[in-house]
């Protein structure tokens, strides 16, 4: 008698999906800050996450910022109010925007409105996240070297009716003129779909002028 093997599916709730996506952004942001040398190598500690060696910053002020950010992102995701999160890397000296790491989020509104759940294997979600993290780790191969001291900021694009904490302020989009863009892998919890794109300043245009 032939037997059938079904792929294991895990129940994904709105709360669980929000936790997955907000945690992903925290680890992705730390990896970007490390791989783009925004902070020195010795500022990070190695941990294991998503079946990969990952790096987390030990600077207390940045850790606190990331913790508050993760909590706020999770809250907005559960409310279905978050459209995208952008990590911006800027020149410390001039404030010029050098890179924008854009995480666009699509939400299954039926889950938000009706409280239903979805099904997807945790392992499948992890594999999709692994692919993104590997691309971030190899960013030195496709992004220009940041040969100056840089700082970062995080922008959140939300629905207009969302309550914004006093710790957040309205900002310009911090765009880059004539950017080069690289589309990275995305992942999907079946409730939140995340697409990733990095845009960067193209110095070659300046050299040709």
UniProtKB/Swiss-Prot annotation:
A single GO BP: cell division
| Subcellular location per the Swiss-Prot or TrEMBL entry | Nucleus; Nucleus envelope; Chromosome; Chromosome, Centromere, Kinetochore
PROSITE patterns xrefs: HORMA (PS50815)
Boundaries of each HORMA domain copy? 15-198
Q: Which residues cross the membrane?
A: none
Keywords for this protein? Cell cycle, Cell division, Centromere, Chromosome, Cytoplasm, Cytoskeleton, Kinetochore, Mitosis, Nucleus
Knockout mutant characteristics: No visible phenotype when grown under normal growth conditions and stunted roots when grown in vitro in absence of sucrose.
Q: What does this protein do?
A: Required for the execution of the mitotic checkpoint which monitors the process of kinetochore-spindle attachment and delays the onset of anaphase when this process is not complete. It inhibits the activity of the anaphase promoting complex by sequestering CDC20 until all chromosomes are aligned at the metaphase plate.
Family statement:
Belongs to the MAD2 family.
Protein's name in the database: Mitotic spindle checkpoint protein MAD2
Source organism of this protein record: Arabidopsis thaliana (Mouse-ear cress)
| Gene, per the UniProt record | MAD2
């Amino acid at each position: 008698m032939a037997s059938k093997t079904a792929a294991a599916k895990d129940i994904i709730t709105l709360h669980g999906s929000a936790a997955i996506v907000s945690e992903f952004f925290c680890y992705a942001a730390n990896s970007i800050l490390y791989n783009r040398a925004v902070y020195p190598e010795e500022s990070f500690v190695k941990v294991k996450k998503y079946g990969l060696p990952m790096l987390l910053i030990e600077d207390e002020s940045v850790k606190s910022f990331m913790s508050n950010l993760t909590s706020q992102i999770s809250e907005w995701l559960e409310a279905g109010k978050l459209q995208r999160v952008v990590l911006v890397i800027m020149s410390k000296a001039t404030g010029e925007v050098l890179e924008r790491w854009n995480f666009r989020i699509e939400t299954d509104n039926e889950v938000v409105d009706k409280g239903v759940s979805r099904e997807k294997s945790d392992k499948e979600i992890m594999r999709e996240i692994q692919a993104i993290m590997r691309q971030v780790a190899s960013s030195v191969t496709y992004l220009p070297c940041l040969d100056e001291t840089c700082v970062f900021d995080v922008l959140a694009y939300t629905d207009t009716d969302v309550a914004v904490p006093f710790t957040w302020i309205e900002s310009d989009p911090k765009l880059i003129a004539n950017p080069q863009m690289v589309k990275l892998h995305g992942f999907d919890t079946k409730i939140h779909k995340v697409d990733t794109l990095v845009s960067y300043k193209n110095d070659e245009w300046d050299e040709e002028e």
